Swiss-Prot record:
Location(s) in or outside the cell: Golgi apparatus, trans-Golgi network membrane; Endosome membrane
Coiled-coil annotated spans: 34-58, 460-484
UniProtKB keywords: Coiled coil, Endosome, Golgi apparatus, Membrane, Protein transport, Transport
Name of protein: Vacuolar protein sorting-associated protein 53
Keyword DNA damage among record annotations: no
Pfam families in UniProt: VPS53_C (PF16854), Vps53_N (PF04100)
Subunit organization: Component of the Golgi-associated retrograde protein (GARP) complex, also called VFT (VPS fifty-three) complex, composed of VPS51, VPS52, VPS53 and VPS54. Also interacts with TLG1, YPT6 and ARL1.
Length: 822
């Protein structure tokens, strides 16, 4: 428990001993033990002190032994130093002998290498005099290696310096000798063609010798290339007629002869890894590139440069580059010769106008409609136009080497836009029948109009891809986009005009007869036994053939106008969108003719004025119209079935959209007819029916017009009674001041003009009581700054049709098929 250390902490033992209250009972015993232990320790200390006093001699003995240890250590050091000196004296002679051995070995090696160098030099000298390059390769390589790597550091020695000078002269003589042989070869002296021995001597001998020194080899290659191209450089000087731009093609032809001659006669005399043909072509490129820059700069100093000459030179250069690229698999790294023409490429782009003018002459003379009915229903000239564009674009990108050149790309974009606009004006727009010419043959007019739409769509969507392609190489995409903006708008306008023509001038030719039958029908005596005659005619007019071979053959002679138009569209998206618009036109016509049939004849509320139809008759008419709507719904549901022969047609999103659109229109018509038939016996019941069918429509003009169409007499008391029930649930908003965009016009949204006429006539009632009711209760006032004049029905329909002009964004999808017609 008690520790014999100076760091002893008594608190730990005290804590352990007195860890509980019970331990206090033994406190006396603990104190007694502690005192006894303390006494024992004091006795031990005294005993140790006494022993130290009794034996002081032990310290002296320890000191003496330490002195003895240090003395022995000093003696050992002295012996060690003496031994080391003795050993050094013994090995000194051995070190001298080792150094002498190394020097002797090095001297022997040096003299051996010197002998080899001398022998190689002598041997090379003899072989050179004999012209034996192949045998000379091995000693020559040894000689060059030793001279450059071993003895160059001993050049200060006269003998070595003399030998190295002799070797240098030998190298020069070797190069001269090799040049003599190649000169004789190129000049066609007494050397026989395809001399095998000479071939081996030059290729495996002379070329191997030249490979020993990079600078010598480069010098020799340049000398050979200069020899091979000497005549060409002399003939085609830029200051001579032969070297002019007019004779550029002759320069290329001449070089081809040089290249072919080299490959057939001289290529075997050089090592393959030298690639002499590639070097020869690269040197020609370098020379011609410099000459071309001079010639083109000189040509365009003139205010009237020859564009034909420029184009001829450019075309011959492009043809030559293609030839070289094919021959050498694009190994030529020298800048292309066509890059010299790049600063003047805007002239090249403008020169393409001549080509396009010729193209347009052929476009205007060829048949507008494809001769083969199975062909894509676009003008063949449009596909040819974009093939031409693609060719021009490809050539331009080759000329600028696929690098960004905004000025050229902008010129190209303007070129494309210009001729696309010309194409729309000269080729496409004439396909559209002018407004001042009556449609004589609706199928013929429809055929060419759909051809216009298909082609304009092809052009419009392809313009986007053309713009994207140009943008890939341009640093100014916005500027390129601006170049195409006007063109895109022109084609969008063409699409809108073509679609509007079909909807407003072709389709109505059939529908007008239907609505004439509607007007001529004896509505006062509606029998309500079968569908009305006008509706049967409408079904016949809109009849769509089933998509089977047999039925198509049956319908080929006289298809319905709608069926013919849908069959001519090049893409299903146009068919679906066109059906959407036709459904809206029929719905609008149905509403307009129903309103005209039932609307009161002004002036209103005159004494003794009678309504066209009594309320009871209007109910009978409504019942007949409900029956007719059943057939109209059937007709609308039949239309989408003929768009495509796809087995999954009913799962098609467009099919579902068109069918849902038709159902929504029919539902609106049903609510309108049911409202016309709603009884007026109870004002509250009528209000409940009205609110349910019009979705709580708050517009007082709509409420008034519906009452007027129901044939209710001009009995102010009856009108106020019905109004009181209606007015309790509506707010006090001034309907006359509410903007049309915020008004819920119910069924009259399809013919706002008729609603406006009714409001105008109602607000101008002369009877003071009626006038007060209209202005204060109904809050209807004449339209401000606007005069609405009643027009004959046919003229009114034409005004409605003009409203059908479509935005191309509502009718055209943005799919792309740039590669069509390729």
């Amino acid at each position: 428990m008690l520790e014999g250390t100076v760091d002893y902490d008594p608190l730990e033992d005290i804590t352990n001993i007195l860890f509980s209250k019970e331990s206090l009972n033994n406190i006396d015993e603990l104190i007694s033990i502690t005192r006894s232990y303390k006494k024992q320790l004091q006795e031990d200390i005294l005993k140790e002190e006494n022993e130290l006093k009794e034996h002081p001699k032990n310290s002296a003995e320890i000191e003496a032994s330490l002195r003895k240890v240090f003395q022995d250590f000093k003696e050992t050091q002295d012996v060690s130093a003496s031994t080391e000196l003795t050993i050094s004296n013994l090995t000194e002679g051995i070190s001298y002998l080792d150094i002498a051995k190394k020097n002797l070995t090095h001297s022997l090696t040096l003299f051996q290498n010197l002998k080899i160098l001398t022998d190689s030099y002598i041997q090379c000298n003899e072989l050179l005099s004999q012209g034996s390059f192949k045998k000379m390769v091995s000693p020559y390589k040894i000689m060059c290696s030793l001279a450059e790597n071993t003895f160059i550091s001993y050049k200060s020695l006269d003998e070595i310096n003399y030998l190295l000078s002799s070797i240098s002269r030998l190298k020069g003589d070797t190069l001269s000798k090799i040049k003599q042989n190649y000169n004789a070869l190129f000049s066609g002296g007494n050397i026989s063609e395809h001399d095998t021995a000479l071939t081996m001597e030059l290729r495996e001998g002379a070329c191997e010798l030249l490979d020993c020194d990079t600078s010598t080899r480069a010098q020799m290659i340049d000398w050979c290339l200069d020899k091979l191209l000497f005549e060409m450089k002399e003939i085609f000087r830029v200051d001579d007629e032969a070297g002019s731009l007019e004779n550029l093609s002759r320069r290329y032809i001449y070089f081809k002869k040089i290249l072919n001659n080299f490959n057939s006669k001289f290529a075997d005399y050089f090592l393959k890894d030298w690639e002499m043909a590639v070097r020869l072509t690269t040197t020609f490129y370098h020379i011609t590139h410099k000459d071309l820059q001079t010639l083109l700069k000189r040509e365009f100093k003139d205010k009237n440069p020859s564009i034909d000459l420029f184009m001829t030179a450019l075309q011959s250069t492009l043809d030559f580059e293609k030839y070289i690229d094919v021959r050498f698999s694009k190994k030529i790294k020298e800048p292309k010769l066509s890059s010299c023409f790049e600063p003047y490429l805007t002239l090249w782009v403008s020169h393409q106008n001549q080509m396009m003018e010729k193209k347009f002459l052929s476009y205007m003379s060829e048949p507008k409609y494809p001769s083969n009915e199975t062909e894509s229903l676009v003008l063949p000239s449009s596909a040819d136009l974009f093939r031409t564009y693609r060719s021009v674009l490809t050539q331009t990108l080759e000329l600028i080497d696929n690098n960004a050149n905004d000025s050229i790309l902008t010129s190209l974009a303007n070129f494309f836009s210009r001729w696309l606009q010309t194409y729309s004006q000269k080729i496409l727009l004439p396909l559209l029948l002018p407004d001042n010419i009556e449609v004589q043959d609706k199928l013929e007019a429809a055929k060419y109009t759909v051809l216009l739409i298909n082609t304009a769509d092809y052009c419009a969507t392809t313009i986007d891809q053309l713009e994207d392609k140009l943008s890939e190489f341009s640093g100014n995409r916005e500027k390129l986009a601006n170049s195409f903006t006007k063109t895109k708008n022109i084609y969008d306008d063409l699409l809108a005009k073509g679609t509007s023509f079909l909807l407003n001038r072709v389709i109505p030719l059939d529908l007008n007869f239907v609505w004439r039958e509607f007007i001529n029908n004896d509505w006062s005596n509606a029998a309500i036994e079968d569908y009305s005659r006008y509706m049967v005619t409408l079904k016949s007019v809109l009849k769509m053939p089933a998509l089977t071979d047999a039925s198509i053959k049956q319908q080929q002679e006289q298809p319905s106008t709608l069926a013919f138009i849908l069959s001519q569209f090049n893409r299903d998206v146009y068919k679906w969108n066109f059906l959407d618009k036709v459904i809206d036109i029929i719905t609008t016509n149905f509403v307009s003719n129903t309103i005209r049939l039932l609307q009161p004849v002004p002036p209103f509320s005159l004494a003794g004025s009678k309504r066209k139809f009594e309320t009871r008759t209007v109910v009978n008419i409504g019942e007949q119209l409900l029956l007719d709507l059943e057939l109209l719904k059937e007709i609308f549901h039949t239309l989408p079935e003929s768009v495509s022969n796809d087995s999954d047609l009913r799962e098609n999103t467009s099919y579902k959209r068109v069918k849902r659109h038709a159902d929504n229109n029919i539902d609106q018509l049903l609510k309108f007819i049911k409202l016309l038939m709603a009884p007026l016996d109870s004002a509250d019941d009528y209000y409940e029916t009205y609110s349910k069918l019009t979705n709580n429509n708050p517009d007082s003009a709509v409420w008034s017009f519906v009452l007027a169409l129901k044939g209710i007499p001009w009995d102010l008391a009856l009108w106020k009674k019905l109004w009181s029930a209606y007015n309790l649930e509506t707010d006090d908003t001034d309907e006359g001041s509410r903007p049309d965009s915020n008004r819920d016009l119910f069924i009259f949204k399809w013919d706002k003009v008729l609603l406006g006429q009714f409001e105008n006539n109602l607000a101008r009632m002369q009877d003071p009581n009626w006038s007060k009711f209209v202005r204060q209760d109904l809050k209807i006032s004449p339209p401000v700054m606007k005069r609405i004049v009643s027009t004959p029905q046919i003229q009114q329909q034409k005004e409605e049709q003009k409203k059908q002009s479509l935005s191309v964004k509502d009718f055209v999808s943005h799919s792309r098929f740039f590669n069509r017609g390729t």
